[in-house]
Amino acid sequence: KMRDAIRCVGHKGTMPTMEFLFRLDQTVNMHGEKTTELVLRKVADKVAARAGLDLVDFSVYPNVDHHPARYEYLFEFYHADHAAIDLAELSRITDEELRAGNYDVSYMTEDGTFAPAIARVLQDETNQLWRDMRVMHGKAPNQIKPVHIVDTEQKRRFFFALIDGEIEG
């Protein structure tokens, strides 16, 4: 009933050890566009593939404080040369893939309801640090879900503090 996507990461005897990947029915809905987490994931995977980077994980911040509102992708890449990443090009690809993934977002960007999506790059190990902090606060490691939608101020402060300032545009 929880609608979580899980992956078996091992066994303890005959009992499988599960890792939560994401909640299946989480959505971003700033202006009625209803972008699902599955669409957000597909966009992240396509952006990484097009940029030739290995994606560790991603988060999306639906920034309603920016005028007009916009999607802000926070990417963590595996052993990427951050100095070689063209942030403007990464943002362009991200916006293009998001528009292709959700036609409402495309239409609303064209009519000015949304600003084009942007991309930011997180420091290495950001997502592991989030997991470690949750464990330190008493959460069971196998119950911690990756943060794909930044939906609280605590998550926003954490992830935005770990944006790689060397390539910030």
Where are these regions (language model features)?
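AMP-binding adenylation
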Residues: 1-169
